[in-house]
Curated annotation (Swiss-Prot):
Pfam families: RNase_H (PF00075). It comes from the Bacteria. Signal peptide: none annotated. GO terms for biological process: DNA replication, removal of RNA primer. It is found in: Cytoplasm. Its EC number is 3.1.26.4. Endonuclease that specifically degrades the RNA of RNA-DNA hybrids. Keywords: Cytoplasm, Endonuclease, Hydrolase, Magnesium, Metal-binding, Nuclease. Residues 3-144 form the RNase H type-1 domain. Monomer. Its cofactor is Mg(2+). This is Ribonuclease H.
Length: 158
C-alpha cells in the first residue's frame, strides 16, 4: 500500500458586517509547493466562510491524503471534531433541539473529510502565524472585491 501524501492546509474566513460580503482564503503546502485559493460572496456570514474554506481545500485534493488542517476558527474545529457526532445522532439538531446552523456546509465538510486522514489544528488568529495571516489577507481581499456570487445556503436570521 502506498503512503498517503502529507498536505498542510491553512484556512480562514472573513465577513464584512456579518452578515455582509464575505470571502475565504486557503494556503496549501505540499513538498515545498504552495497553492493559494480564495473566493468571495455577496451576502454571507463569517462562520459560513470559515466552513467553506476547508471544504473547498479538501474537495480540491485529487486523492486521499494525510492532511494537517490549521484554522483560527474554534467553531469549525470544535464542530467537525466534537459536536458533529451528536448532531448526526439527533438528525442535525442541537442539544436544545434546534436545527444546526449552516447544516448544508457541515454535511459537505463531513463528506469531504471522510476521504482523508485529518489532523484538525487551531491557531490563534492575528498572532503572526505566516500562513494564517496570508489566509486572512486572501479572505479579506475576496470579501472587499465587491463579490456578486450568491451563497446559496445562506439563510438570514428571522
Amino acid at each position: 500500500m502506498t503512503e498517503l501524501k502529507l498536505i498542510h492546509i491553512f484556512t480562514d474566513g472573513s465577513c464584512l458586517g456579518n452578515p455582509g460580503p464575505g470571502g475565504y482564503g486557503i494556503v496549501m503546502n505540499y513538498k515545498g509547493h504552495t497553492k493559494e485559493m480564495s473566493d468571495g460572496f455577496a451576502l454571507t456570514t463569517n462562520n459560513r466562510m470559515e466552513l467553506l474554506a476547508p471544504i473547498v481545500a479538501l474537495e480540491a485534493l485529487k486523492e486521499p491524503c494525510k492532511v494537517i488542517l490549521t484554522s483560527d476558527s474554534q467553531y469549525m474545529r470544535q464542530g467537525i471534531t466534537t459536536w458533529i457526532h451528536g448532531w448526526k445522532k439527533k438528525g442535525w439538531m442541537t442539544s436544545n433541539r434546534t436545527p444546526v446552523k449552516n447544516v448544508d456546509l457541515w454535511k459537505r465538510l463531513d463528506k469531504a473529510a471522510q476521504l482523508h486522514q485529518i489532523d484538525w489544528r487551531w491557531v490563534k488568529g492575528h498572532a503572526g502565524h505566516p500562513e494564517n495571516e496570508r489566509c486572512d489577507q486572501l479572505a479579506r481581499a475576496a470579501a472587499e472585491a465587491s463579490p456578486t456570487q450568491v451563497d446559496e445556503g445562506y439563510q438570514p436570521e428571522s
